[in-house]
Design a protein with these regions (language model features):
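Conserved RNase H-like, two-metal-ion catalytic cores of nucleic-acid enzymes
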Residues: 50, 67, 105, 112, ...
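A charged, amphipathic alpha-helical module
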Residues: 220-334, 344
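Short His-Asn-centered micro-motif
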Residues: 252, 340-342, 413-416
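Acidic, Mg2+-coordinating catalytic module of metal-dependent nucleases/exonucleases
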Residues: 183, 188-200, 204-264, 282-288, ...
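Conserved DEDDh/DEDDy metal-dependent 3′-5′ exonuclease domain
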Residues: 104-114, 118-122, 133-136, 154-224, ...
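Metal-dependent nuclease catalytic cores that hydrolyze phosphodiester bonds in DNA/RNA
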Residues: 1-129, 272-307, 313-319
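Flexible loop/turn segments at secondary-structure boundaries
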Residues: 28-30, 141-143, 184-185, 261, ...
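Conserved catalytic cores of phosphodiester-cleaving nucleases, focusing on short active-site segments
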Residues: 15, 108, 119-144, 161, ...
Length: 539
């Protein structure tokens, strides 16, 4: 019989083939991206912090000689803790009495096994009649419990735990999701009670409460039996085809393997396709799947199908340059032009005052200034990189920014939503810089516009209008504009976000090299915008 952990169960729930591949063809699995790795690291930190929600926490974790969880020992330890709890006071954990001498027992990593199914409950909280499951996630939700649609993806995980515990004879009296409060703003020391939101998964929603666990709980034994039977056969690969489960609730790392039969490019490379995208010119994922199921998978298969303007250019491999529209865009610019780009980092648990979970914290910016039309600036612009001392970088960055960009300036960015948001956030916490920062924000012009609107399109862009796609399409033979050629360790925003917080713990020589790498990367971001602007000027 194949053992099923809660992670394996939820993988099966999303896609049986994904679980089978994870067990028998793990070498086909893509490496998780930087954001996924950071989310996993954040989950560990958030999980430990959640222990502080309760004063009477005992940890059932036991590790072997290699530092790995000793599941058998953890199960035995959990049983002993629960047996000893029979003498503990029976206080309702939802009565806000945690600081009293009668606080309920809380077992962290409480481990259980039944018929080949294993789970370790993040926090198992004693109640007057049994035990409540508390599953800790590093996601953030509003104080009002979020919405059922946002929370449903956590239900299979919790339902599996409830089923295993119930089969082990535990009376599960409640199931809860413990997550970060999206509304929490740090002021001084962390307020653990305000940092977290505890959501009753059997009573979700304000206007029309829903039990998100009941239906999933009934499916658990059926799914367990099917998953265990499937995993007994290492030779027969499941036949699940491409569908929504390839991206929801989590992107599948076996996509390249499962889509290897598709031509390149394929229908799934056509511009658009987010589950939540809206707009007449978006090529919805549902539409892509409809074409795929009908056998229309290559660009040639799509030529005679109804398409939006951008999709049509992409599928027909058109080069489209609308000189008039580009000129109209350029005429909106006011000189001198200040080309600006921020680098940011984010923390699941706010590190600084006046910040929220996962808020983007600007620690660096780059600036190139073009004084007049038909002129060009030096390749090396002005760069600001905050001190690597662990302090909040935003104040000094905002001061430096205001010193270099005057009020009323025309500031050019690429995808203005990001820079506008950072400027607004800093303006809100620094009253003396408020007007200046908002003036910079109000003067922003978005260089993305002529590409996003389809005024300038080349087949090499592949339907993507990010600067990382536009730049090599416009300058295919310029090694100085190739991010891969940057020296050092920083070649993209994810690496910048990861490396900066680590610099303070690096040896001096390594720290200096990392800072130089950050400066060169960010400088290329704004120099790239200057080159793109110059290309548009010569249309």
């Amino acid at each position: 019989m194949t053992n099923l952990s809660k992670s394996k169960y939820t993988t099966y729930w999303q896609c049986p083939k994904m679980l089978w591949l994870d067990v028998y063809k793990r070498g086909e699995k893509a490496e998780p991206d930087m954001s996924t790795k950071m989310r996993l690291e954040a989950g560990t930190k958030v999980g430990k912090l959640a222990h502080q929600l309760f004063p009477n926490v005992v940890d059932a974790t036991v590790t072997d000689a290699n530092g790995n969880p000793d599941t058998s020992a953890m199960i035995a330890r959990t049983q002993q803790m629960m047996a000893n709890s029979s003498n503990s006071p029976k206080i309702n954990p939802r009565s806000n009495s945690f600081n009293s001498p009668n606080s309920p027992l809380v077992i962290a990593e409480a481990a259980f096994s039944y018929n080949g199914c294993y789970c370790a409950v993040d926090l198992l909280v004693q109640t007057p009649d049994g035990w409540d499951i508390h599953e800790v996630k590093s996601s953030s939700f509003p104080e009002q419990d979020g919405s059922p649609s946002e929370l449903k993806k956590y239900a299979p995980d919790i339902a599996f735990q409830k089923w295993v515990l119930t089969q082990c004879g535990v009376n599960v009296t409640g199931t809860h999701l413990v997550c970060l409060s999206a509304e929490y703003v740090r002021h001084g020391d962390l307020d653990i009670q305000q940092l977290f939101v505890i959501i009753d998964m059997q009573n979700v929603g304000v206007k029309k409460p829903m039990d998100l666990i009941a239906d999933e709980y009934l499916k658990v034994p059926i799914n367990v039996a099917k998953a265990q039977k499937m995993l007994t056969d290492s030779q027969t690969e499941p036949t699940e085809d491409l569908d929504r489960h390839c991206e929801k609730p989590y992107p599948c790392l076996f996509w390249d393997y499962c889509s290897r039969h598709l031509p390149s490019p394929s229908v799934f490379d056509v511009y658009g396709g987010s589950f939540t995208s809206k707009g007449d010119d978006r090529f919805y994922l549902d539409k892509k799947l409809e074409h795929y199921r009908a056998g229309r998978v290559s660009y040639d298969d799509l030529v005679d199908q109804p398409l939006g303007i951008i999709q049509r250019m992409q599928v027909e491999r058109q080069t489209h340059i609308d000189a008039g529209a580009i000129r109209s865009f350029l005429n909106t610019l006011r000189y001198p032009l200040y080309f600006l780009d921020f680098e940011t980092m984010q923390f699941a648990v706010p590190e600084y005052d006046d910040s929220k979970p996962y808020q983007q914290i600007a620690f660096q910016y780059s600036l190139h200034v073009v004084e007049a039309p038909n002129t060009i600036c030096d390749k090396k612009g002005h760069g600001y990189l905050a001190p690597s001392d662990g302090s909040d970088p935003r104040r000094k960055l905002a001061e430096d920014l205001c010193a270099y960009i005057p009020m009323g300036a025309c500031t050019v960015v690429y995808n203005d939503t990001f820079e506008k948001s950072r400027l607004k956030e800093m303006a809100e916490i620094y009253p003396d810089l408020h007007d200046h920062l908002l003036s910079i924000r109000d003067g922003i012009c978005d260089l993305l516009v002529p590409f996003r609107e389809g005024h300038y399109y080349l087949p090499a862009m592949g339907g993507s209008f990010s600067i990382k796609s536009v730049l090599p399409a416009l300058f295919p033979s310029d090694p100085d504009l190739d991010y891969h050629n940057l020296p050092g360790t920083v070649h993209n925003g994810g690496e910048a976000m990861t490396i900066f917080p680590l610099i303070q713990s690096m040896p001096p020589a390594e720290a200096d090299a990392a800072r130089q790498s950050l400066l060169e990367y960010c400088n290329l971001d704004t120099w790239a915008m200057v080159k793109v602007w110059d290309k548009l000027m010569h249309v």
